[in-house]
């Protein structure tokens, strides 16, 4: 059985996985697997209007890549990456994905993302290596999410942005740390 993951190019986070019953047929491009974007759901807390059907975050295909990986199994003999993809990262060497997945640190606090109309602040679990790439994606209506890249320079990421007050789905990707989706209340 083959196992293919779709991952974030910049931070190497696994965002989705599929298992095929056929033999390995090479590594596909992410596009044929996800189309124009990969819709992610899994918001941990939905305050306010988002409870009635917040849009998922649709990660654009140009932010994604695909890789054939080893199917390490959990206790039930089922590849754990199929049930908890956000908990894994792809091993990348010389810009090429390898077949081994790595488990990621999930030491997030209960509400690590705070936002105002001018800035998003993410409190990071520790330790996170200085200079690690990060990507925060904010779903803003029906269009593509706002992509906010950053580098880790301390215990928090602070990213300038321009948002209206309201509740937004936010995907946080920091290399080495489990991916996370939250509904974030943006205050004035």
Summary of predicted features, one role per range:
Residues 1-97:
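Long, contiguous interaction/targeting segments characteristic
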Residues 9, 140-142, 176-178:
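Solvent-exposed strand-loop boundary residues in beta-sheet-rich modules
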Residues 80-129:
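Extracellular ectodomain segments of secreted/surface proteins
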Residues 115, 152, 163-165:
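Surface-exposed coil/turn segments at beta-strand junctions on protein surfaces, enriched
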Residues 127-146:
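Extended low-complexity, serine/threonine- and proline-enriched intrinsically disordered segments
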Residues 135-137, 163-183:
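Short, aromatic- and glycine-rich surface loops/edge beta-strands on solvent-exposed regions
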Residues 140-158:
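Solvent-exposed serine/threonine-rich low-complexity stretches and specific carbohydrate-binding patches
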Residues 184-188:
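Short beta-strand edge segments in extracellular beta-sheet folds
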């Amino acid at each position: 059985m083959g196992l293919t993951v779709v991952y974030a190019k910049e931070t190497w986070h696994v965002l989705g996985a599929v298992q095929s019953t056929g033999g390995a047929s090479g590594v596909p491009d992410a596009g044929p697997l996800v189309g124009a974007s990969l819709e992610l759901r899994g918001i941990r807390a939905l305050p306010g209007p988002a409870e009635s059907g917040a849009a998922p975050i649709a990660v654009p295909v140009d932010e994604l890549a695909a890789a054939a990986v080893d199917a390490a199994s959990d206790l039930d003999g089922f590849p754990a990456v199929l049930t908890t993809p956000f908990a894994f990262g792809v091993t990348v060497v010389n810009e090429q994905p390898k077949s081994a997945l790595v488990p990621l640190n999930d030491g997030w606090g209960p509400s690590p993302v705070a936002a105002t109309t001018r800035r998003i602040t993410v409190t990071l679990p520790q330790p996170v290596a200085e200079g690690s790439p990060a990507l925060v994606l904010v779903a803003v209506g029906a269009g593509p999410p706002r992509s906010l890249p950053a580098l880790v320079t301390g215990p928090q990421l602070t990213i300038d942005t321009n948002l209206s007050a309201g509740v937004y789905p936010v995907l946080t990707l920091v290399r080495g740390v489990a991916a996370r989706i939250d509904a974030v209340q943006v205050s004035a």
